[in-house]
Amino acid sequence: MRLDQVRAALDRRLDPASRAPLAVGFSGGGDSLFLLKTVLDWARPLDRPVLALVVDHQLQPQSTAWTAEAVAKARALGAAALGLTWTDQKPRTGLPAAARRARHALLATAAREAGARVLILGHTASDLAEGVAMRAEGSSVSNPRAWAPSPVWPEGRGLFVLRPLLTLTRAEIRDALTREGETWLDDPANLDLRYARARARAAGALTPLLPVRESPPPGVFEIDPAGAIRLPRDVVPAHLAAALLCASGAERPPRGDRLARLVERLRSGARFTATLAGARIEADQAVLICRDAGEAARGGLARLDLAPGACGVWDGRWEVVAGKTALAVVALRGRTSSLPAEQRARLSAIAPAVRPSLPVLLSLDGDAPGELVLDDLQLEADGEARVRSLVPDRFKAAVGLLDQESVT
């Protein structure tokens, strides 16, 4: 077994000097059992805490008992453990995709609240191969990457997912566990042929795939404090998609024909303005990508109310923590004239296309004027509200510039 490759992946990505907990997705199944034992072996000499997170999707009658059993197993192995329950109403269609989204949201929220920066998951080479078969059936399941930002937003902000088992097959893992005398839980959903994953497994003899190679990070880009991204016109499609994703605050990047057509227009050298996936694109000598303020007419840039001390994410782009007073976060569009003269003067340094989608903080305690947020440290009038642009770190993570825990 290529166990040395698994340990090398942990060494490559994790910071041995950190004392932040390592979050591990744990179901009690074979893959996650092998993963948890391996992570514990890696973390124990470093005196680093490991937190096993067990998700109960509430899709099987026995799920509560299975969750309790998995939590007990994780604790017996030496990890802290927490059960998480998907309590939302289950959709009649698209259940696998909804369950994936809910699972990642629960895991990300719990990991962040525990102080973890990395969530470690047990996807294998077999999962890579099954994903090919599933996508051939029309599934939206993505190709697991060895290191990637959390796929849910904004719950997963600042959190990375590490998958160190992608070079091992499920059979290899189970053989190793059997030699160690271990037993594991088997989810009956894995045998339910109503689901694409089960059909892919039942097909058998899938060709294992190597993990996907990522595009090299962009050599030239600029992100200003207002959250706009500037890229060269010859930007590769993956990085263009990442810029559109981050500038718009959306959860999923654009793909397919629409992205391909935008790339072609950029390659043509023509000057143009366009919108795509909630972002505005201005192509001149370089490409300016920012939030499309017109999305306000379609429900975007919605007002965010925060109680004193509460934290929230506005429009997927700005994290705001209220101070001693309640506040609302709204878009600047249509409010410029109500700002103090000093604030209006500062707007001249910002590209006109970027201005309408900037955040404004409004005090809900009295009639204090709004505060335009122009940089990460702009404070509310009471001097306590904190505001942080999420765009820079999210873009750097999306294009592979944050490739280790120590640089996140």
From Swiss-Prot:
It is found in: Cytoplasm. One of its GO terms (biological process) is tRNA modification. Signal peptide: none annotated. InterPro entries: Rossmann-like_a/b/a_fold, TilS/TtcA_N, tRNA_Ile_lys_synt, tRNA_Ile_lys_synt_N. Coiled coil: none annotated. It holds the Pfam family ATP_bind_3. Its EC number is 6.3.4.19. Transmembrane segments: none annotated. Keywords: ATP-binding, Cytoplasm, Ligase, Nucleotide-binding, tRNA processing. GO terms for cellular component: cytoplasm. ATP binds at S27, G28, G29, G30, D31, S32. GO terms for molecular function: ATP binding; tRNA(Ile)-lysidine synthase activity. It catalyses: cytidine(34) in tRNA(Ile2) + L-lysine + ATP = lysidine(34) in tRNA(Ile2) + AMP + diphosphate + H(+). Gene3D superfamilies: HUPs. The N-terminal region contains the highly conserved SGGXDS motif, predicted to be a P-loop motif involved in ATP binding. Belongs to the tRNA(Ile)-lysidine synthase family. Ligates lysine onto the cytidine present at position 34 of the AUA codon-specific tRNA(Ile) that contains the anticodon CAU, in an ATP-dependent manner. Cytidine is converted to lysidine, thus changing the amino acid specificity of the tRNA from methionine to isoleucine. This is tRNA(Ile)-lysidine synthase. It comes from Caulobacter vibrioides (strain ATCC 19089 / CIP 103742 / CB 15). The lineage of its organism: Bacteria, Pseudomonadati, Pseudomonadota, Alphaproteobacteria, Caulobacterales.
